[in-house]
């Protein structure tokens, strides 16, 4: 019998040079050999970049803004996470995906190098949502306080150092966003920014609809924007992850959906931390055309 202590708060495991959550890494062979379908739609992000938000938007776009249809099940069932595997506790992402009808929505945080080859071979459409690194670091820290599948984050100062060096689950934010940005030159990838979606959700939802070849009128777009607002989603038990056991996600430590704003990093970074981060950021992001806004 598997006990939670066998997989909770374990150190990350290296998979092909990338640090991956312990229980996910133990299921690696199944992930690597995953069989995609040509009409699969992949929703990819670095953790804490608005994954659940964009997942619910995509589901609503595909269902023409039908709120009742979108209430059919939990987000973890509608948009399974490819690499999710928690032994004895819940259906794995792959098991859920095998049950889901086409077109399937597939969530992942995997870096380009670890994504199953099948997705490239089938030329699957992909949506990548990127968020500025400073807000990601703060959000990821709070997430790791409550997500017991991750190693304990320790103090914020130490966590930020690990984040800057890529010593967190899924590795370096810098490498993640840069590699997905580059890949869009040769593959159908819609690359979106969290800050743009916050600033002008209608424009960004229209981009998603066009990418998925859906023609939605203003009324439907407005309904989608209302239903997927941070306030609505934070209180929606189908998407706010309160349905997961508290042994896995302890909402008393921090809520899954915490603030959902751009610029919260300013409440956490010291002047010295910010200066050091900026130096590393400039070095890591030199040579890329990627541009991020740290506030809007």
From Swiss-Prot:
E.C. designation(s): 2.8.2.1
Catalytic residues in the record: 109
Superkingdom, natural source: Eukaryota
Catalytic reaction(s) noted: a phenol + 3'-phosphoadenylyl sulfate = an aryl sulfate + adenosine 3',5'-bisphosphate + H(+); 3,3',5-triiodo-L-thyronine + 3'-phosphoadenylyl sulfate = 3,3',5-triiodo-L-thyronine sulfate + adenosine 3',5'-bisphosphate + H(+); 3,3',5'-triiodo-L-thyronine + 3'-phosphoadenylyl sulfate = 3,3',5'-triiodo-L-thyronine sulfate + adenosine 3',5'-bisphosphate + H(+); 3,3'-diiodo-L-thyronine + 3'-phosphoadenylyl sulfate = 3,3'-diiodo-L-thyronine sulfate + adenosine 3',5'-bisphosphate + H(+)
Keywords annotated in UniProt: Cytoplasm, Transferase
GO annotations of cellular component type: cytoplasm
Alphabetized InterPro entries for the sequence: P-loop_NTPase, Sulfotransferase_dom
Any one GO biological process: flavonoid metabolic process
UniProt: 3'-phosphoadenylyl sulfate binding residues: 48-53, 131, 139, 194, 228-233, 258-260
Summary of the tissues where the protein is detected: Expressed highly in the colon, kidney and small intestine of male and female dogs. Highly expressed in the jejunum and ileum of the male dog than the female dog, which displayed more expression in duodenum (at protein level).
Main location per the UniProt record: cytoplasm
Pfam families: Sulfotransfer_1
Subcellular location: Cytoplasm
Binding site for substrate: 107-109
Molecular function terms from GO: aryl sulfotransferase activity
Protein family per UniProt: Belongs to the sulfotransferase 1 family.
Its job: Sulfotransferase that utilizes 3'-phospho-5'-adenylyl sulfate (PAPS) as sulfonate donor to catalyze the sulfate conjugation of dopamine, small phenols such as 1-naphthol and p-nitrophenol and thyroid hormones, including 3,3'-diiodothyronine, triidothyronine (T3) and reverse triiodothyronine (rT3). May play a role in gut microbiota-host metabolic interaction. O-sulfonates 4-ethylphenol (4-EP), a dietary tyrosine-derived metabolite produced by gut bacteria.
Additional detail: Contrary to other mammalian orthologs the canine SULT1B1 does not shown sulfotransferase activity toward dopamine.
Protein name per Swiss-Prot or TrEMBL: Sulfotransferase 1B1
């Amino acid at each position: 019998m598997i006990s939670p202590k066998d997989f909770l708060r374990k150190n990350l495991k290296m998979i092909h040079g990338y640090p991956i959550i312990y229980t996910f890494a133990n299921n690696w062979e199944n992930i690597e050999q995953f069989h995609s379908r040509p009409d699969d739609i992949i929703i990819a992000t670095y953790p804490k970049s608005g994954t659940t938000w964009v997942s619910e938007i995509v589901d609503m776009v595909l269902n023409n803004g039908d709120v009742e249809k979108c209430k059919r099940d939990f987000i973890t069932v509608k948009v399974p996470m490819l690499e999710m595997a928690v032994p004895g506790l819940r259906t794995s992402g792959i098991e859920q995906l095998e049950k889901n009808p086409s077109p399937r929505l597939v969530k992942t945080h995997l870096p380009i190098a670890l994504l199953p080859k099948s997705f490239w071979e089938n030329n699957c459409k992909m949506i990548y949502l990127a968020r500025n690194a400073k807000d990601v670091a703060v959000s990821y820290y709070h997430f790791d306080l409550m997500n017991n599948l991750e190693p304990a984050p320790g103090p914020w100062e130490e966590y930020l150092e690990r984040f800057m060096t890529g010593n967190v689950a899924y590795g370096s934010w810098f490498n993640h966003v840069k590699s997905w940005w580059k890949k869009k030159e040769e593959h159908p990838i819609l690359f979106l920014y969290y800050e743009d979606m916050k600033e002008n959700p209608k424009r960004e939802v229209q981009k998603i609809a066009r990418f998925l070849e859906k023609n939605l009128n203003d009324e439907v777009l407005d309904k989608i924007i209302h239903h997927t607002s941070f306030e609505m989603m934070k209180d929606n038990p189908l998407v706010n992850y309160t349905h997961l056991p508290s042994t896995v996600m302890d909402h008393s430590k921090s809520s899954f959906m915490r603030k959902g704003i751009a610029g919260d990093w300013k409440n956490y970074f010291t002047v010295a931390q910010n200066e050091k981060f900026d130096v590393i950021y400039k070095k890591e992001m030199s040579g890329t055309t990627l541009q991020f806004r740290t506030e809007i």
